[in-house]
Amino acid sequence: MKALTYHGPHHVQVENVPDPGVEQADDIILRITATAICGSDLHLYRGKIPQVKHGDIFGHEFMGEVVETGKDVKNLQKGDRVVIPFVIACGDCFFCRLQQYAACENTNAGKGAALNKKQIPAPAALFGYSHLYGGVPGGQAEYVRVPKGNVGPFKVPPLLSDDKALFLSDILPTAWQAAKNAQIQQGSSVAVYGAGPVGLLTIACARLLGAEQIFVVDHHPYRLHFAADRYGAIPINFDEDSDPAQSIIEQTAGHRGVDAVIDAVGFEAKGSTTETVLTNLKLEGSSGKALRQCIAAVRRGGIVSVPGVYAGFIHGFLFGDAFDKGLSFKMGQTHVHAWLGELLPLIEKGLLKPEEIVTHYMPFEEAARGYEIFEKREEECRKVILVPGAQSAEAAQKAVSGLVNAMPGGTI
């Protein structure tokens, strides 16, 4: 099969690799019909994450058709159309029973990213996200082996197009969990730092949950314009405003700040010189600019929700300010499985339209170019979907939009 493989920072290529096969009795093999490039993939692409090896297959946002099942798979059969959570969970351990699937104790043979973990078990394995998280081949490929086939795969209704369902794999549940963690309710005020795919969908979720005043902070004008035009967010460009938190506070009741802030940036994917040195030492770091801004912008007693990925040290983390303001922090990888039953009806009813953030539909063969476009924000790129078998951008979009490919094997 063809897969996108890693060969060093900024060097990925589509090449032929062995087809995956069933290894455990509850595995399934999936034919990929749509796969996406995630913002967190850029950390891997840029060489910012330790234990990424030459030949590794990226990709944790994917869906497709079941083509083979292990003998113990009970919930699926060949031909089923499913979307796959990026978190691999066993469904039966202490944490899975708490619906904290990202903390599953039984799927990750790696050590995770915690620097001071002691004897605490590693978190769940993640598809295509380094050997820290299990070294499980990802879904930027024509086929993929999916472990725990009775637990993770989520059946997609026949009339729901791939581009509407695909982001149930990661960024829509991530956005939803971030908004829920922020305890957004009718009339809330919230500031979202980062207008990438997760940030934009977080704004959509916040609006649906009743947020009245939403600020969005970024420095890409086209993203800010989209957030303002589509979701009614108040845009702040930090290239033009050196202190967005101050501007936010000045526009809130009593100059108290917003009820909640959501950091959809995480450690900066571009990386400063300091961050690069720390990466080489296997101690990833972040300047912490976004997080400091979040702490400054939120009101006393407010909530800081962090869906953005962090690892290692945070430089200049103003813990004293957080203590003084009595802030609550909620963060971590997304417990995808817990949210799917809640989110699917919202998509079916048109209350959430995750596909609207997509700007680029591309043939899978052009995946390396897709990474370049997404990384450099060329062509006003917000989100890239890659489609195996498509021969052109038009064919790729046709294959995953509307009712095309809504049933295995063809068009309705």
From Swiss-Prot:
Gene3D superfamilies in the record, alphabetically?
Medium-chain alcohol dehydrogenases, catalytic domain, NAD(P)-binding Rossmann-like Domain
Name the coiled-coil region(s).
none
Question: What is a GO molecular function of this protein?
Answer: zinc ion binding
Q: What is its EC number?
A: 1.-.-.-
Q: Which PANTHER family does the entry link to?
A: DEHYDROGENASE, ZINC-CONTAINING, PUTATIVE (AFU_ORTHOLOGUE AFUA_2G02810)-RELATED (PTHR42813:SF2), ZINC-TYPE ALCOHOL DEHYDROGENASE-LIKE (PTHR42813)
Q: Can the keyword Metal-binding be found in this entry's annotation?
A: yes
For this chain, the family text in UniProt reads: Belongs to the zinc-containing alcohol dehydrogenase family. Class-III subfamily.
Annotated Zn(2+) 2 binding lies at 90, 93, 96, 104
> Which keywords are on file for this protein?
Metal-binding, Oxidoreductase, Zinc
Q: Which cofactor does it need?
A: Zn(2+)
The identity of this protein, by name, is: Uncharacterized zinc-type alcohol dehydrogenase-like protein YbdR
User: Where does this protein hold Zn(2+) 1?
Assistant: 38, 60
Q: Which domain of life is it from?
A: Bacteria
Q: Name one Pfam family in it.
A: ADH_N
How is the cofactor bound, in the record's words? Binds 2 Zn(2+) ions per subunit.
